[in-house]
């Protein structure tokens, strides 16, 4: 089964080897037909402390690192993935 990959913005890098990433999703409301924005914060493992606040990054599902951390930062961040595409 493939691992899910999400794109978001780093909102906190104060913890050691951990970043908090805000991921926004958009959907059309079934009755109002209006685009609705919802966001969720994910704690992700950042082994080398490379991500900085405000940076756009990709996170990938992984094994549990702790009670809250079940995602990891994709190596290289958004710049590396964008250049490959």
From Swiss-Prot:
GO terms for cellular component: cytosolic small ribosomal subunit. It holds the Pfam family Ribosomal_S17. Keywords: Ribonucleoprotein, Ribosomal protein, RNA-binding, rRNA-binding. It comes from the Bacteria. One of its GO terms (biological process) is translation. The keyword Transmembrane helix does not apply. Belongs to the universal ribosomal protein uS17 family. InterPro entries: NA-bd_OB-fold (IPR012340), Ribosomal_uS17 (IPR000266), Ribosomal_uS17_bact/chlr (IPR019984). SUPFAM superfamilies: Nucleic acid-binding proteins. Part of the 30S ribosomal subunit. This is Small ribosomal subunit protein uS17. The keyword NAD does not apply. One of the primary rRNA binding proteins, it binds specifically to the 5'-end of 16S ribosomal RNA. One of its GO terms (molecular function) is structural constituent of ribosome. NCBIfam families: PRK05610.1, uS17_bact. It comes from Methylobacterium nodulans (strain LMG 21967 / CNCM I-2342 / ORS 2060). HAMAP family: Ribosomal_uS17_B (MF_01345_B).
């Amino acid at each position: 089964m493939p691992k899910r990959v999400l794109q978001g913005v780093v909102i906190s890098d104060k913890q050691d080897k951990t970043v908090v990433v805000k991921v926004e999703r958009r959907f059309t409301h079934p009755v109002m037909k209006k685009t609705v924005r919802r966001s969720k914060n994910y704690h992700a493992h950042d082994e080398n402390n490379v991500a900085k606040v405000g940076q756009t990054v990709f996170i990938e599902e992984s094994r549990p690192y702790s009670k809250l951390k079940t995602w990891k930062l994709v190596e290289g961040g958004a710049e590396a993935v964008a250049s490959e595409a």
